[in-house]
Amino acid sequence: MKKINLAISGCLGRMGQQLIKSSKNNKNFKLTALTENKAISKKIAGIKLDVNTEQTFKKTDVIIDFTVPNCTLDILKIASKLKKRVVIGTTGFNQKEEALIKKFSKTIPILKAGNMSLGVNLLMYLTEITSKSLNEEYLSKVFEVHHKHKKDYPSGTALMLGKGIADGKNKNLYNLMGKKFLNKKSFPYGKKINFNSIRKGEIIGEHEVTFSSGKEIIKLNHEAFDRALYSDGALTAAKWLINKKPGLYSMRDLLNFR
């Protein structure tokens, strides 16, 4: 099988570094480009760091992006022109940016996920099923913990779980979005979905969804111990996307969760 030419955008970040390591150990990929938003005179794995340009991505089959929203949109403009596939692991998009991603997906295959872990995506699926099975008596909230360097909150994964709750009720997450707390020891339930984000230490990721009727509490949770589970998932997504038609895909499509 011919190796897939891979570009990693956001290569100096935590996920970027892990992706470089994982891709070097994966026989399906050949690392062809490493980029950052600003020019940096440096080589990693024998590859000179570059900025996001058409020339940089010319020989690439698929781009894995772990950057920031405005950078992701710049990458999508280039990828759309070159007809390159993009795996988006970036989080923190607003509604307007989400709409632009959907627009780009009409011309190129895009897989977007706030979390590339099999376990987290299974948790999201179970969250939706649970939400669908419970009546309005049950209130829900989402709790997440990440390392102190993570800036956005709630995390992309927490929002995925919130979407799972909303989807279970056949409602839009933005209409069910409750309060967003940061570094609170405890936080309340509400008629809408409340989120609490903790930022401390070097924690890779912990997520918990809770449903409460006042008579009982149902908890669904996931804890990550190794960042490689995310990079391995991103590479699996990149390989899967190679033979796909233009469209906006998720890990749920890849894992065939219905």
Curated annotation (Swiss-Prot):
Organism phylogeny: Bacteria, Pseudomonadati, Pseudomonadota, Alphaproteobacteria, Candidatus Pelagibacterales
UniProt cross-references to InterPro entries, sorted A to Z: DapB_C, DapB_N, DHDPR_bac, NAD(P)-bd_dom_sf
Function noted in UniProt: Catalyzes the conversion of 4-hydroxy-tetrahydrodipicolinate (HTPA) to tetrahydrodipicolinate.
Gene name of this polypeptide: dapB
Residue sites binding NAD(+) per the record: 10-15, 89-91, 113-116
Protein name: 4-hydroxy-tetrahydrodipicolinate reductase
Principal cellular location given in the protein's record: cytoplasm
Residues annotated for NADP(+) binding in this entry: 38
Pathway: Amino-acid biosynthesis; L-lysine biosynthesis via DAP pathway; (S)-tetrahydrodipicolinate from L-aspartate: step 4/4
